[in-house]
């Protein structure tokens, strides 16, 4: 079982969309996937629950609210969810730096943090890296945080200006981005469809946008498998 946490202290950067695309790609490969949604907005859950009713390969979990700010309580609550064996676990987090995200960072094998060529999003990755360092310290891990963090560069629509070029170079040079995914209208609207790409094509939807989404999903899953040599 591999545990992947999608995280950034900056909200609205596309964590839930990337998490869903990743799940979509893994499901098409025949993997058994569990999603854990720690974002109070529940965006990933809203996409996944209808699919889980149709596919036993997808499991959806939401951690019950814990009033305590104890790291140990949140960490142990996640451990309890992970007791049911699956091939992959994908954790979606809120755009914050609360104790739930700290636990999600501590429990995972890999952190994926999306960023476009915007200073606020790059700073969100940098803050997430520092928070990951804190999380690893909490569990006594000596793994270097940079070894666990992978940045997915999200290429915006239109032509980038000079500042965007600078930010893109920073993302690749400093963080070593693993992918370049185009923020197309099809991908950004993916969560609202509440079905997998394969289901949408089978249902008779225009295949073109879904094939683009599948290509993006495949890039993500190939990157994941490359990280773990699986």
Q: Could you tell me what each predicted segment is?
A:
Residues 123-152, 161-170, 174:
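Anionic-ligand binding region
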Residues 3, 7-9, 13, 21-90, ...:
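P-loop/Walker-type NTP enzyme "switch/lid" segment
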Residues 17:
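Conserved Walker
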Residues 1-4, 160:
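Pre-Walker A (Motif I) flank of P-loop NTPase domains
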């Amino acid at each position: 079982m591999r545990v992947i946490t999608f995280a950034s202290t900056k909200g609205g950067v596309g964590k839930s969309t990337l998490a869903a695309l990743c799940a979509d790609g893994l499901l098409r490969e025949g993997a058994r996937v569990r999603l854990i949604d720690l974002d109070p907005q529940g965006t990933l859950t809203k996409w996944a629950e209808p699919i889980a009713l149709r596919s036993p390969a997808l499991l959806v979990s939401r951690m019950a609210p814990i009033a305590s700010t104890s790291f140990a309580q949140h960490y142990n609550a996640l451990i309890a969810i992970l007791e049911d064996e699956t091939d992959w676990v994908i954790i979606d987090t809120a755009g914050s730096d609360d104790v739930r995200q700290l636990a999600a960072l501590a429990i995972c094998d890999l952190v994926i943090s999306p960023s476009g060529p915007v200073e606020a999003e790059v700073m969100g990755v940098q803050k997430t890296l520092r928070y990951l360092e804190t999380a690893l310290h909490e569990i006594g891990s000596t793994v270097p945080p940079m070894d666990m963090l992978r940045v997915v560069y999200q290429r915006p629509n239109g032509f980038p200006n000079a500042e965007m070029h600078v930010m893109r170079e920073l993302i690749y040079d400093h963080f070593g981005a693993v992918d370049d995914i185009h923020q197309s209208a099809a991908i950004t609207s993916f969560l609202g469809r509440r079905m997998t790409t394969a289901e949408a094509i089978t249902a008779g939807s225009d295949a073109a946008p879904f094939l683009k989404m599948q290509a993006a999903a495949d890039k993500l899953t190939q990157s994941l498998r490359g990280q773990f040599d699986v």
